[in-house]
Amino acid sequence: MAAPYSPVMARLGDIVFDAAHPASLARFWAAALDGYAVAPYDEAELARLRANGVADPEDDPSVLVEPAVPGPPRLFFTLVPEPKTVKNRVHLDLRAADPDAEAARLVRLGATQLARLDGWVTLADPEGNEFDVLPVQ
């Protein structure tokens, strides 16, 4: 059970991914995670992009993926100039009723399977960020 909100302690807000191609990586994670979608581009957002010299949302340097319900963290995908070069120091653990079937679905979406261990599967997203798929607890 979660502790009540404390104005003194920090809370997890957003998870931010550095990305070479924020829009395509955002689409991968929106499809990968239950209850998440790429935030829509309304007129105000399109105007913000144009004001920053971005004509096409596909070239947006910072793409938001939102949960369908309040509570879970939002995901931001931010353009960075350098490629990923080493293993993640932090990774996400996804939970699924059937980790092998879920890993196969994620591979069809563009992930790469890195390892199959006892009870879980390690994958990398299309830009090489490692994550695990484990059984539901």
Regions found by a protein language model. Name each.
Residues 7, 18-71, 102, 108, ...:
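Core segments of cupin and vicinal oxygen chelate
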Residues 29, 127-130:
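Short, glycine-anchored, charge-dense loop/turn motifs used at functional sites
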Residues 21-24, 70-71, 81-127:
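Vicinal oxygen chelate
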Residues 73-78, 132:
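Conserved beta-strand in the GNAT
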Residues 1-8:
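Short, Lys/Arg-enriched N-terminal segments with co-localized hydrophobic residues
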Residues 13-15, 90-91:
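Short active-site oxyanion
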Residues 133-137:
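Short beta->alpha transition motifs characteristic of CBS
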Residues 11, 59-61, 88:
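Residues that flank catalytic or metal-binding motifs in active/ligand-binding sites
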